[in-house]
Regions:
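Short catalytic/binding micro-motifs of nucleotide second-messenger systems
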Residues: 1-8, 38
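EAL-family c-di-GMP phosphodiesterase catalytic domain
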Residues: 6, 19-28, 47-62, 74-185
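Conserved C-terminal helical docking segment of ANL/AMP-forming enzymes
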Residues: 38, 44-46
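Structural preference for long, well-ordered alpha-helical segments in enzyme cores
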Residues: 1-3, 33-34, 67, 122, ...
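Catalytic core regions of nucleotide second-messenger enzymes
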Residues: 7-14, 42
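Short conserved micro-motifs at the rims of enzyme active sites and ligand-binding pockets
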Residues: 29-30, 37
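Conserved catalytic network of the ASCE P-loop NTPase/AAA+ motor domain
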Residues: 10, 70-71
């Protein structure tokens, strides 16, 4: 589907993120399967992103490091999902080849005065390590604006719309592209 959408909306950068399960991560043929999907679908590897949770990586850190390094060599993106909620060490941010962290919704929802300090610290740390940042579970425009001002590149939220089936994506993209075009007089 992604390759078709890329042809249909050539000037619009499109990518897809896929959650990886622990069972998939330990499969011996995972890397060759991903390589095959990329070749078969004719998508650019950089348009595919795999998302893994901290706990998934922690189940077997040596195996995870080995597999993730091979996957990264294919040119795909790797995201550390639910960042900050697991029992990992910050050293894993340098040990594993992630290029993005996804700050867990619990930090965005936190109503304590320390919320902004924690969020800003995570965004700054990620950037210092060369990682991009996605904040999950944004509840309103003020959250989105605050995170943008902190330097968070992406936000993810049902506020922007619910998940949709693949056949609905072209219509949604057309609507978003039309809405982003300047009005003509």
């Amino acid at each position: 589907d992604l390759a078709l959408w890329q042809k249909q909306f050539g000037d619009t950068p499109l990518s897809v993120s896929v959650n990886l399960s622990s069972r998939q991560l330990i499969r011996r043929d995972l890397v060759s399967d991903v390589r095959s999907v990329i070749a078969r679908s004719s998508i650019k590897p950089r348009c595919l992103r795999l998302e893994l949770t901290e706990s998934l990586v922690m189940d077997n850190p040596e195996q995870a490091a080995h597999v993730l390094t091979k996957l990264k060599k294919l040119g795909i993106g790797l995201s550390l999902d639910d960042f900050g909620t697991g029992y990992s060490s910050l050293s894993y941010l340098t040990r594993f080849p992630f290029d993005t962290i996804k700050i867990d919704k619990s930090f965005v929802d936190d109503a304590t005065p320390k919320r902004s300090v924690l969020l800003r610290s995570m965004v700054n740390m990620a950037h210092e390590l060369g990682l991009s940042v996605v904040a999950e579970g944004i509840s309103d425009q003020s959250d989105a604006l605050e995170l943008r001002q902190m330097g968070c590149e992406y936000v993810q939220s049902f506020m922007f719309g619910p998940p949709v089936a693949g056949e609905q994506v072209p219509r949604l993209l057309k609507e978003q592209i039309a809405a982003s075009q300047p009005a003509r007089a």
